[in-house]
Amino acid sequence: MWLVEANGTVIRSYLVSGKYRTPAAGTYSVFSKSRHTSAGHDGITMNDMVRFARGSRLAIGFHGIPRDRYGRPLQTEHDLGGFRSAGCVRQSDGDAAFLYDWAPIGTTVVVLH
């Protein structure tokens, strides 16, 4: 993933995990943010959620590595870079916090496959 300023300067790049071809390639816009949220099932929680697309049931966004009801991570940062999610884009917790602070509502998101 690349974080790119309006002038084209890449300010940060890093590995993420997502779901194959989800969301569809295209241009989106950040429409909602939450420091702490849940997946709505199984007690799974995520930090630094930045929502930019709509899924069939829930919004799709960037967030830190999800945790189960006991606080255990669902994957390690070492595992980032593969298909490991139900639709959202997982980042390291540090990268998720940076993106949360960097991207205000309305920020353009371009998804490539």
Describe each model-derived feature in a short phrase:
Residues 1-34, 45-49:
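Cell wall/extracellular polymer interaction/catalysis modules
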